[in-house]
């Protein structure tokens, strides 16, 4: 079983302009399954905001992917089949999907907004 963790409140340092919330504390899945992590974004301009996803393993942060206004994901490092991101404009939520889970996917995952 693989354990994916993330904090309840995520990294948005905008001095009261908004909030990011990841409501689940952990997700456990079997190897080769998929896992989804959601991030609720409380910003007045969600539709125009790029949501960025990171993971932390052994005190090292890794940038994974971002999703912008037009639902297009912008992966780095050729991970577009392994890692996907999407936005739901009705619920102001971004979702990270990790496919084909492996032991090395165990990490703490973060969503972020650059202001």
From Swiss-Prot:
Q: Which GO terms describe its biological process?
A: adaptive immune response
Record's SMART domains? IGv
Q: What Gene Ontology cellular-component terms does the record carry?
A: T cell receptor complex
Q: Please indicate which superkingdom the organism of origin belongs to.
A: Eukaryota
**Which Gene3D superfamilies does the UniProt record give?**
Immunoglobulins (2.60.40.10)
Bilayer-spanning residue ranges: none
Keyword flag Signal: yes
Residues making up the signal peptide according to the UniProt record? 1-18
InterPro entries per UniProt = Ig-like_dom (IPR007110), Ig-like_dom_sf (IPR036179), Ig-like_fold (IPR013783), Ig_V-set (IPR013106), TRG_var/const_region (IPR051117)
Q: Segment V segment: which positions?
A: 19-115
Per UniProt, the keywords (alphabetical) are: Adaptive immunity, Immunity, Immunoglobulin domain, Receptor, Signal, T cell receptor
Q: What's the protein called, per UniProt?
A: T-cell receptor gamma chain V region V108B
Organism equals Mus musculus (Mouse)
Please state the gene responsible for encoding this protein. Tcrg-V1
């Amino acid at each position: 079983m693989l354990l994916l963790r993330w904090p309840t409140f995520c990294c948005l340092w905008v001095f009261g302009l908004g909030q990011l919330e990841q409501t689940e504390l952990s997700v456990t899945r079997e190897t080769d399954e998929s896992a989804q992590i959601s991030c609720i974004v409380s910003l007045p301009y969600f539709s125009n905001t790029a949501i960025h996803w990171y993971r932390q393993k052994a005190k090292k942060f890794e940038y994974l992917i971002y999703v912008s206004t037009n639902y297009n994901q912008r992966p780095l490092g050729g991970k577009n089949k392994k890692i996907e991101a999407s936005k739901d404009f009705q619920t102001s939520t971004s979702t990270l999907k990790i496919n084909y889970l492996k032991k090395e996917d165990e990490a703490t995952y973060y969503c972020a907004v650059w202001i």
